C-alpha cells in the first residue's frame, strides 16, 4: 500500500507542477529549523518528494507566517510544545515553477509526538546539526546554510 500511495501522491504532485508551469502562481511558505531541547534538528521525509526536509508548508497571503509555521509543525510532526520562535530570514525562490516567498524560522525546545500515520509525512528523524543525514533535499541544504548564522 505504501508504494501505491507514494506513486499516487507523486502523480498528483506532478500534475500540480504542470499547472504551476502554466500559471506561475505567487505562493508563500513558512518553514522551520525545529530544534529539540537537546539541540537536534527535526527533519521530515514527505511521501511525494525525495530527501529530508525542514518541516513547513504553504500559507495564505494574509496568514501570519509565524502562525503558519507553528500550524505546520503541529500538522507534520505532532508538535505539542515549543520555546522561542525566531524569524531567521526570507528567501525568494522558484520551486516547481512557482514564485515563492519562504519565511524561515528557528523554533527552539520543540516537543512532539509523531502521529502513527500521515498522508503527507512518511518519516521523522532527529539529527545533530553537525551530523545531518545523507539525502538532504537541495532546498533543505540551502535553508540550513542560511539559518546556521542565526543560531
Set out the residue ranges of the language-model regions.
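A short coil-to-beta-strand element that immediately follows conserved catalytic motifs
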Residues: 80-90
Amino acid at each position: 500500500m505504501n508504494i501505491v500511495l507514494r506513486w499516487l501522491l507523486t502523480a498528483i504532485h506532478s500534475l500540480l507542477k504542470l499547472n504551476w508551469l502554466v500559471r506561475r502562481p505567487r505562493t508563500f511558505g513558512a518553514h522551520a529549523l525545529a530544534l529539540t531541547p537537546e539541540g537536534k534538528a527535526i527533519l521530515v521525509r514527505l511521501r511525494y518528494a525525495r530527501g529530508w526536509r525542514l518541516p513547513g508548508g504553504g500559507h495564505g497571503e494574509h496568514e501570519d507566517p509565524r502562525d503558519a509555521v507553528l500550524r505546520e509543525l503541529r500538522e507534520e510532526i505532532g508538535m505539542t510544545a515549543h520555546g522561542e520562535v525566531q524569524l531567521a530570514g526570507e528567501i525568494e525562490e522558484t520551486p516547481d515553477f512557482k514564485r515563492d516567498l519562504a519565511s524561515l524560522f528557528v523554533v527552539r525546545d520543540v516537543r512532539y509526538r509523531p502521529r502513527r500515520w500521515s498522508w503527507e509525512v512518511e518519516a521523522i528523524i532527529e539529527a545533530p546539526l553537525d551530523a545531518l543525514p545523507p539525502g538532504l533535499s537541495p532546498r533543505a541544504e540551502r535553508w540550513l546554510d542560511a539559518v546556521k548564522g542565526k543560531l
